[in-house]
Amino acid sequence: RSWYYMEIFTDPSNENVVYVLNAPVLKSIDKGKTFQPISVPHGDNHHLWINPLNPKNMINSNDGGANITFNGGESWTRQDQQPTAQFYRVITDNKVPYHVYGGQQDNSAIGIASRTNGRGITWKDWYSVAGCESAYLAFDPNNPETVFGGCYQGIIDRWSRSTAASKSIKEYPELNLGNVPKDFKYRFNWNAPIISSPHDRSVIYHAGNVVFKTLDGGINWEVISPDLTRNDKAHQGPGGGPYTNEAAGGENYNTLMYLTESPHEKGVLWAGSDDGLVHLTRDGGINWSNVTPKELPEAIVNSIEVSPHDPAAAYITVMAYKFNNLKPMVYKTSDYGVSWVKRVSGIDDQTVVRVVREDKEVEGLLYAGTEAGLYISFNGGVFWQKIQLNLPIVPINDLTIQDNDLIAATAGRSFWILDDLGAF
């Protein structure tokens, strides 16, 4: 997986010592002539910090988090000694205390209580749910007995809390490992959207390059949209290049990245693709309109937020970092996508914005999760300012609001909760 592993490090005090990071960690003591694996707590290794004053002290980052050694890799800290999970999305239920759910890289999709009666939240408060590492999760927040969760290649499971049993309910039961996307029946993003309807929680939507709908827990699925992507066959070849096909689906392109249903109007669905398109249906999928902002480049539509105060208003966040463009892109519509205005003033010019959420109580009070922390706007995005507080400077992949708390899903520092948004 040459696109996934690409880091080589040398010991700053010994030019003969070289580390190559891959699924394992490889070490050479003869300038790369020979290599031997060194034991690390987790696979899929991506980065290594070597203390220039003491090269036996290193930090390894990997798909499971981060680990520290003080003896040159003979032993490492455990994976569960610090909150270094990497979450894709976040969703909550309405329990008291509410539980927070998300899919975390390499360590399964989980739920966790937001508060405990003990001495802090620990691993005893975590439990696995449906799906896998890349999961979107969906359920009835008032009764999260049944959880729907995703995995790569469009896999989707239905999990029962009372039995802890899962059942695969994929629309078209195929696993495309080793095939190329242009030959797939349906194309799914690594992080394929799954949502439940806020108007009828028995209705579940799942998005690939089209939108699927089920009324019976995934026994039967209906396609309710055409292909809502650019469907460019030239970009649907083998992932990772012709010699090292990535296979698992991390490079699938021309897929839907985000799907949401209006909390105000049943059947009003917004869909965003990873190739820069925004579509809207106002009749449950019978008719779809392309409402993409005219200036939008080919890029990832990572989130769509329908205003909780105005059914015609929505915010989208767009990421073009795969095109070496790190500029923030936030757009607002007040007329169901007929027109859009850009809303990025105050955000650092080279800071990708991943998600925007609007406060449920105060209209125009917005929160933006970016590649380098949190921003806030008090006027509908006309101007933004940083609000980092004690939150680590870390990518924020998703945000949600529950019981007047702001919950952040981060890439590298797990979940964080900002209590009592009423202070704003």
Segments predicted by a language model, with ranges:
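Beta-propeller blade termini and top-face loops
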Residues: R1-F424
